[in-house]
């Protein structure tokens, strides 16, 4: 099997070189090129035809979100966004990125190397298997599910999503009415991002959406999103309904 061809788009020379050095240590990955801004990236895409592109959001000459909006209709490819803790990452997902990782501080080299090997590399390998047309199709189909309504208060809707799933989840939730049974959602995200994602969905939909906390009740018209990181959300039966319990735990399936 040939290695995954990766293009790195990053304006920080220090972080860019760290990405190159650490990704090249894995024989399953071939870094075919780097770019400092979207204009260099455009030329590199045409020259190297990468399987996956990593993309910083904050770039000179054109930001990463605008670049994605221009790129994806003409040259769709799996893109993993590397972003600081900002809700701009969801705009990037909406523009066509398949996944994202939280950009660590540049002050600790060993932590940076661990991040690249244990988080970014995993995302790149998963992204290389993504079918962009399928992801977009699923998002469109999900947006058509607009007629699910409440039948019994004890019903619970469960949503789980990973790579490429944030925009599909958003499309589903925007189609729900306020009489939908209570929703619990597990969305694969780094710590810190789930709270921003919940606020975004709360503003965009007819539901009351929040990041879950222990003791929160699962109520019709409400949606609870499990916190990112190493915490797990568990449903607990209380009378005729449910509430959630959030506690630390080992990762399940990565």
Predicted feature locations:
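Conserved acid/base catalytic micro-environments in cytosolic active-site loops
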Residues: 2-7, 13-28, 34-54, 58-254
């Amino acid at each position: 099997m040939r290695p995954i061809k990766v293009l790195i788009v990053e304006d920080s020379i220090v972080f860019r070189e760290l990405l190159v050095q650490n990704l090249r240590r894995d024989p399953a990955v071939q870094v075919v090129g780097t770019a400092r801004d979207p204009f260099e990236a455009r030329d590199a895409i045409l020259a190297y035809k990468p399987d996956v592109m990593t993309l910083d959001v904050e770039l000179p000459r054109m930001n990463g979100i605008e670049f994605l909006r221009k790129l994806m209709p003409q040259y769709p490819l799996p893109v993993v966004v590397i972003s600081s803790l900002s809700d701009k990452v969801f705009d990037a997902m909406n523009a066509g990125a398949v996944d994202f990782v939280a950009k660590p501080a540049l002050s600790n080299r060993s932590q940076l190397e661990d991040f690249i090997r244990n988080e970014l590399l995993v995302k790149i390998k998963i992204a290389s298997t993504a079918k962009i047309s399928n992801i977009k199709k699923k998002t469109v189909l999900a947006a058509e599910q607009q007629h699910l309504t409440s039948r019994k208060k004890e019903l619970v809707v469960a949503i789980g999503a990973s790579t490429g799933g944030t925009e599909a989840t958003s499309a589903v939730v925007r189609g729900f009415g306020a009489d939908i049974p209570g929703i619990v959602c597990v969305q694969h995200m780094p710590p810190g991002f789930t709270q921003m994602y919940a606020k975004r969905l709360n503003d965009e939909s007819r539901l009351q959406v929040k990041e879950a906390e222990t003791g929160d009740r699962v109520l019709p018209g409400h949606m609870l999103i499990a916190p990112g990181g190493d915490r797990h959300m568990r449903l607990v039966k209380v009378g005729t309904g449910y509430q959630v319990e959030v506690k630390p735990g080992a990762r399940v399936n990565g």
